[in-house]
From Swiss-Prot:
It comes from Staphylococcus aureus (strain Newman). The lineage of its organism: Bacteria, Bacillati, Bacillota, Bacilli, Bacillales. Pfam families: DapH_N (PF08503), Hexapep (PF00132), Hexapep_2 (PF14602). This is 2,3,4,5-tetrahydropyridine-2,6-dicarboxylate N-acetyltransferase. It is an enzyme of class 2 (transferase). NCBIfam families: DapD_Ac (TIGR03532). PROSITE patterns: HEXAPEP_TRANSFERASES. Keywords: Acyltransferase, Amino-acid biosynthesis, Diaminopimelate biosynthesis, Lysine biosynthesis, Repeat, Transferase.
């Protein structure tokens, strides 16, 4: 199973990162004689522009040229952000629109991340694992191969305090919708976590757990294969 950054490494990364407040500015007006800073990305026509820049760079620019603008609309979706979203260019996985995957997360081959899922810094999505809609993998949460994390499920993150152990989900585990796996819990290979379960302690390999807090109710071998099947076709990419 892939392991990634330690809590201390993540804390150092966040501390050292240049904090960013990117904005997108839509402008109508007279742009004659305007000089744009090198840090600006500018698109548009003679009468209209779209500018991508940092909020701190926009302020002096506006003070210098604001009288020439007729209409202004500014979009800002973060403030002093330390962690950008992950560049997915070389990710060999299926990532659906609306998934939030932060830099320094690992997405292994053949994984699937569905709409609205959140993968935080230091988290690992194992080979062939599916993270369903609106599920959350907190910082350093780690899944093995061929895991299914159900819609709305939460694998708690541990960056603070740094001494805490991360959630570890071993291979071939099924986690039902809206289940919560608390910090430091390890779920053994082939286990099944029922929908809505609150998992506060380690789960043995091959066990089925349910309840709040959860307890072992039977063995996974007693569950019909059709109810725990991992479908390879859903992980297939273009040939």
């Amino acid at each position: 199973m892939v392991q990634h950054l330690t809590a201390e490494e993540i804390i150092q990364y966040i501390s050292d990162a240049k904090k960013s407040t990117p904005i997108k500015v839509y402008l109508n007006g007279n742009f004659e004689g305007i000089t744009y800073p090198e840090s600006f990305k500018v698109f548009g026509s003679e009468q209209s522009k779209v500018i991508f820049c940092e909020a701190d760079d926009w302020k002096p620019f506006y003070e210098a040229y604001g009288s020439q603008f007729e209409d202004i609309e500014i979009e800002m979706d973060r403030r002093n952000s330390a962690i950008p979203l992950k560049d997915l260019t070389n990710t060999n996985a299926r990532i659906e629109p609306g998934a939030f995957i932060r830099e320094q997360a690992i997405i292994e081959d053949g994984a699937v991340v569905m709409m609205g899922a959140t993968i935080n810094i230091g988290a690992v999505v194992g080979e062939g694992t599916m993270i369903d809609m609106n599920a959350t993998l907190g910082g350093r949460a780690t899944t093995g191969k061929n895991v299914h994390v159900g819609a709305g499920a939460v694998l708690a993150g541990v960056i603070e305090p740094p001494s805490a152990s991360p959630v570890i989900i071993e291979d071939d585990v099924l986690i039902g919708a809206n289940a919560v796996i608390l910090e430091g819990v390890r779920v053994g290979k082939g286990a099944i976590v029922a929908a809505g379960a609150i998992v506060t302690q380690d789960v043995p390999a091959g066990a089925v757990v349910a309840g709040t807090p959860c307890k072992v109710i039977k063995a996974a071998s007693e569950v019909q294969d059709t109810k725990k099947e991992i479908v390879a076709a859903l992980r297939k990419l273009n040939d």
